[in-house]
Swiss-Prot record:
<dbReference type="GO" id="GO:0047394">
    <property type="term" value="F:glycerophosphoinositol inositolphosphodiesterase activity"/>
</dbReference>
<keyword id="KW-0378">Hydrolase</keyword>
<dbReference type="Pfam" id="PF13653">
    <property type="entry name" value="GDPD_2"/>
</dbReference>
<feature type="binding site">
    <location>
        <position position="259"/>
    </location>
    <ligand>
        <name>a divalent metal cation</name>
    </ligand>
</feature>
<feature type="binding site">
    <location>
        <position position="257"/>
    </location>
    <ligand>
        <name>a divalent metal cation</name>
    </ligand>
</feature>
<comment type="similarity">
    <text>Belongs to the glycerophosphoryl diester phosphodiesterase family.</text>
</comment>
<dbReference type="GO" id="GO:0030027">
    <property type="term" value="C:lamellipodium"/>
</dbReference>
<feature type="topological domain" description="Cytoplasmic">
    <location>
        <begin position="176"/>
        <end position="189"/>
    </location>
</feature>
<dbReference type="InterPro" id="IPR030395">
    <property type="entry name" value="GP_PDE_dom"/>
</dbReference>
<dbReference type="GO" id="GO:0046872">
    <property type="term" value="F:metal ion binding"/>
</dbReference>
<keyword id="KW-0963">Cytoplasm</keyword>
<dbReference type="GO" id="GO:0045669">
    <property type="term" value="P:positive regulation of osteoblast differentiation"/>
</dbReference>
<dbReference type="GO" id="GO:0005737">
    <property type="term" value="C:cytoplasm"/>
</dbReference>
<feature type="domain" description="GP-PDE">
    <location>
        <begin position="225"/>
        <end position="480"/>
    </location>
</feature>
<feature type="transmembrane region" description="Helical">
    <location>
        <begin position="190"/>
        <end position="210"/>
    </location>
</feature>
<keyword id="KW-0325">Glycoprotein</keyword>
<dbReference type="GO" id="GO:0005884">
    <property type="term" value="C:actin filament"/>
</dbReference>
Length: 539
């Protein structure tokens, strides 16, 4: 890359010291960058891109990181919110790779050798291995998150494109400098083709790859999706409690989504986990049964448990607002609600109820009749059947026969439907496979889960989704418009202006650097000629 001593100022020496960890000045024969150094610089650039990509992945996965936290708790038995840790580690990796890459580019511009120190080489390899391990782990354990990442590009691609254009434009100066420094024609042509090939692809990205439902006119924007509280309002109150039910109503949500199990004596109650240890004080009340299945406890035993103190000891969501004094006192006194009790409270708050029904263990008394036990509890509550959104597929035909006014919710598209569905409840990753307009024409409403971040809510809003299940109803309630909305003509104008400005800057940089290189060659030839004249005169 560099083939001349270049500037030997203190500034350049400091940069070289940080990059190579050597303060001493190199002799002339060592002032050149070897092929090995070029390979390491390429690895540095690759590491920067990998760490930047991993930062993007981390930011997108924050929407689903509560699943990761619960997964680790089930396997390790210790609760920790990994949001801050993930962001901190990835930010450090990106910062280190960015600073090292910046040092390398500045050294190249100063004509200094790119002798990367062994410590930096080891750290770069560790970063590559760490990112690779993260990607492999993501692919093995949470493969559905790749669908989340692809979906996120519909929300971020227009802005990533502008960032990519800015980045390739800034990269033009060191590329032009390298182009005019190297002499063999082959490497010069290869460098030029590679750089301008990548540049052309970036310029044409909106035409080739970018599409988003939020590129639309304001008048075409669908109505704001309704909100479904995921286990209630778990950022404001302990999940699956009556306090969480009340907070859901205060958020303006229309539906309370919960999970139902059947106790050992046949009482349906609210609980998500197969073990009670995460959301109750079972460890202190029944220490010998801490690993027992939630359905193995009788209703009398479940009533002895506290379902709120854990929420005050370890807030499950990073960044959630602290509770006021009255809310803290209410949370401390929460217990596990029975389904019948919940239905009566929901009716008073004008909330609908949607729930997952979890089958008890095989040796359970109600293993075969848990659906009937749950249905009996619903009917015994003497509430409107229309307020219950029935999601379980088990014995659905019998449920419809006994409770015909109950709304049937399907958790899949197609399949063995017992009637024409009116509601679909699907993961948000299924959005690309859905034809929302066609479903609406068939009078089918679509609810997608679990949506916590404004960027994702905005995307689903633009796509015309009817409602979303969320942990952050208090946040999404405040949104009056999507985060961004661009009319097609305006986006086209931004795209053209951005590309044209970049093209002008690229041409200017290459012309300017070419002029500098020409003057340097002329000056060098003049100096050589004067030296020969002086030598001839001295003879």
């Amino acid at each position: 890359m560099a083939d001349s001593p270049g500037c030997c100022s203190i500034w350049a020496r400091c940069l070289h010291c940080l990059y190579s960890c050597h303060w001493r000045k190199y002799p002339k024969q060592k002032m050149q960058t070897s092929k090995c150094d070029c390979i390491w610089f390429g690895l540095l650039f690759l590491t920067f891109l990998l760490s930047l990509g991993w930062l993007y992945i981390g930011l997108i996965l924050l929407n689903d990181l509560h699943n990761f936290n619960e997964f680790l708790f089930r396997h390790w038995g210790h609760w920790m919110d990994w949001s801050l840790i993930v962001l901190l580690v990835v930010s450090l990796l990106v910062t280190y790779a960015s600073l090292l890459l910046l040092l390398g580019l500045l050294l190249q511009l100063c004509g200094q050798p790119l002798h990367l120190h062994s410590l930096h080489k080891v750290l770069l390899l560790l970063i590559v291995l760490l990112v690779a391990a993260g990607l492999v782990g993501l692919d093995i354990q949470w493969r559905q998150e790749w669908h989340s990442l692809r979906l996120s590009l519909q929300a971020t691609a227009p802005f990533l494109h502008i960032g990519a254009v800015a980045g390739i434009t800034l990269l033009a100066w060191p590329v032009a400098d390298t182009f005019y420094r190297i002499h063999p024609r082959g490497p010069k042509v290869l460098l030029l083709l590679l750089f301008f090939g990548v540049t052309l692809v970036i310029y044409l990205m909106p035409l080739l790859f970018i599409s988003s439902p939020c590129i639309m006119k304001l008048r075409d924007l669908p109505p704001k999706p309704g909100l479904v509280g995921h286990r209630g309002a778990p950022m404001l109150a302990p999940e699956n409690t009556l306090m969480s039910l009340r907070k859901t109503a205060e958020c303006g949500a229309a539906v309370f989504e919960t999970d139902v199990m059947v106790s050992s004596d046949g009482v349906p109650f609210l609980m998500h986990d197969e073990r009670l240890s995460r959301t109750t004080n079972v460890a202190s009340v029944f220490p010998e049964r801490i690993s027992a299945h939630s359905s193995d406890f009788s209703w009398a035993e479940l009533q002895r448990l506290n379902a709120g103190t854990w929420f005050l000891e370890r807030q499950p969501f990073w960044g959630a607002k602290k509770l006021s004094g009255s809310d803290r006192k209410e949370a401390e006194n929460q217990t596990i609600p029975a389904l019948e009790e919940l239905l009566k409270e929901a009716a008073a708050l004008n909330l609908s109820i949607m729930f997952d029904l979890r089958r008890p263990p095989r040796n359970h008394t109600y293993y075969d009749t848990f659906v009937n036990q749950t249905l009996e509890a619903v009917l015994s509550a003497n509430v409107s059947q229309a307020m219950v959104l029935w999601l379980p597929d088990e014995d659905r035909a019998n449920v419809q026969q006994r409770a015909p006014r109950m709304r049937q919710i399907y958790g899949h598209q197609g399949g063995n439907w017992t009637e024409r569905p009116q509601f679909l409840n699907l993961p948000y990753q299924d959005l690309p496979a859905l034809d929302i307009k066609a479903l609406h024409q068939d009078n089918i409403s679509v609810n997608l889960f679990v949506v916590n971040k404004p960027w994702l809510f905005s995307l689903l809003w633009c796509a015309g989704v009817d409602s979303v299940t969320t942990n952050a109803c208090q946040l999404l309630q405040q949104m009056q418009n999507p985060l961004w909305l661009l009319p097609p003509q305006k986006y086209l104008m931004i795209w053209v202006i951005t590309d044209c400005a970049s093209i002008l800057l690229l041409l200017s940089i290459f012309l300017l650097r070419g002029g500098c290189a020409k003057r340097n060659r002329t000056g060098l030839e003049t100096a050589v000629l004067l030296t020969k004249i002086n030598n001839f005169a001295s003879e």
